[in-house]
């Protein structure tokens, strides 16, 4: 809605100088829709990115130097859909001794999409096994688009959040890390009613008995053609709930199902259009927000995107950068 846009523009202008700049990065700092995880055995960092069979980079610290290690699935996915050799939006988790990586098979503007999964014991290139589709799939008749997966466990239950544009963000219960639960029906957890519903990249995490739902909004791509109007570029927002399955509201109590969302990070200084975010619970730095952004000192094309990260600060159980 128009009011939603005005609120975000106001918040963006008010916070333009309030954010900390991204933490240092050296080596291979390119990324797009990053997935980030710290290996349990030795603390080594692995960063995954959209493109090809999912790019892998690794480093001994968040600051780098990051090395390019190849791909998760060099030949692409076994899911037979357009986009199977150009996989998107990796999401990582660790469960019972195994690392799981969710990825999306789709193409721009299409709802012919599926969420696939690969597993590894180490996260190293060459160690991944593709299991194909999780059963989370969409077609043009679906109310959602099954990309941008994000896993969370609550007690003995596992869930995957997903969605982009259309009716935005949904959640479905999983049988295990590989397959959706039989008979489970996705339910909506967030919706932006304005315009063409620019909302995607759900990432949920838990802290102090709250579940936080972060997501990206605004215009994600096309900066190499033109700059969007100020405030219309990618940004990161957050809502929270005492339940992982719904009831998310922003700082003002506005429901995430009714265009709610408190701004967490937007363009500032040399950082333009941050998004595609996730949260790492780092062994030494605590909760770390990671994302991609266009560095205005380098370029605005996807090929120029950079890896950004910031330690989160907390006030009244709300995160800030």
UniProtKB/Swiss-Prot annotation:
Q: What is its EC number?
A: 3.2.1.99
Please provide, alphabetically and separated by semicolons, the GO molecular function terms listed in this UniProt record: arabinan endo-1,5-alpha-L-arabinosidase activity
The biological process GO terms on file are: arabinan catabolic process; xylan catabolic process
Could you list this entry's UniProt keywords, alphabetically sorted. Carbohydrate metabolism, Glycoprotein, Glycosidase, Hydrolase, Polysaccharide degradation, Secreted, Signal, Xylan degradation
- Its domain of life reads Eukaryota
Localization recorded for this chain is: Secreted
| Signal peptide range in chain numbering | 1-18
A GO cellular component annotated for this chain's UniProt record is: extracellular region
- Annotated glycan sites: 192, 224
Q: Where is the active site?
A: 33, 200
Q: Return the broad EC class.
A: hydrolase
Catalysed reaction(s)? Endohydrolysis of (1->5)-alpha-arabinofuranosidic linkages in (1->5)-arabinans
Residue ranges of coiled coil: none
The protein's site described by Important for catalytic activity, responsible for pKa modulation of the active site Glu and correct orientation of both the proton donor and substrate is found at 148
Pathways per UniProt:
Glycan metabolism; L-arabinan degradation
Q: Sorted alphabetically, which InterPro entries does this protein's record hold?
A: GH43_arabinanases (IPR050727), Glyco_hydro_43 (IPR006710), Glyco_hydro_43_endo_a_Ara-ase (IPR016840), Glyco_hydro_beta-prop_sf (IPR023296)
Entry-linked CDD domains: GH43_AnAbnA-like
Entry's family note: Belongs to the glycosyl hydrolase 43 family.
What job does the chain carry out?
A: Endo-1,5-alpha-L-arabinanase involved in degradation of pectin. Its preferred substrate is linear 1,5-alpha-L-arabinan.
Q: What is this protein called?
A: Probable arabinan endo-1,5-alpha-L-arabinosidase C
Q: What organism does the UniProt record list as the source? A: Aspergillus fumigatus (strain CBS 144.89 / FGSC A1163 / CEA10) (Neosartorya fumigata)
Point out the gene that encodes the protein: abnC
């Amino acid at each position: 809605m128009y009011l939603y846009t005005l609120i975000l523009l106001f918040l963006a202008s008010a916070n333009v100088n309030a954010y900390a700049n991204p933490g240092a990065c050296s080596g291979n700092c390119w990324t797009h829709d990053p997935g980030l995880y710290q290996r349990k055995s030795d603390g080594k960092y692995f960063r995954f990115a959209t493109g090809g069979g999912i790019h892998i980079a690794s480093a001994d610290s968040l600051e780098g130097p990051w090395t390019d290690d190849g791909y998760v699935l060099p030949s692409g996915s076994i899911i037979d859909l357009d986009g199977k050799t150009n996989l998107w939006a990796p999401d990582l988790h660790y469960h019972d001794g195994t690392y799981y990586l969710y990825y999306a098979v789709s193409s721009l503007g299409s709802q012919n999409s599926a969420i696939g999964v690969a597993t590894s014991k180490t996260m190293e290139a060459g160690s991944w096994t593709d299991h194909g589709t999780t059963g989370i799939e969409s077609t043009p008749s679906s109310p959602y688009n099954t990309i941008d997966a994000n896993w969370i466990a609550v007690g003995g239950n596992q869930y995957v959040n997903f969605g982009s544009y259309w009716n935005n963000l949904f959640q479905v219960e999983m049988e295990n890390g590989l397959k959706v639960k039989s008979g489970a029906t996705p339910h909506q957890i967030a919706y932006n009613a304005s315009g063409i519903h620019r909302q995607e990249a759900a990432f949920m995490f838990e802290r102090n008995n709250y579940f936080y739902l972060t997501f990206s909004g605004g215009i994600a791509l096309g900066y190499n053609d033109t700059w969007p109007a100020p405030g219309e570029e990618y940004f990161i927002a957050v809502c929270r709930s005492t339940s992982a399955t719904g009831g998310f509201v922003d700082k003002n109590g506005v429901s995430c199902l009714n265009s709610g969302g408190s701004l967490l990070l937007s363009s500032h200084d040399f950082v333009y259009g941050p998004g595609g975010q996730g949260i790492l619970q780092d062994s030494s730095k605590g909760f770390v927000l990671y994302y991609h952004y266009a560095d205005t000192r380098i370029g605005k094309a996807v090929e120029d995107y950079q890896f950004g990260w910031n330690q989160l600060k907390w006030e009244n159980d709300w995160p800030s950068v």
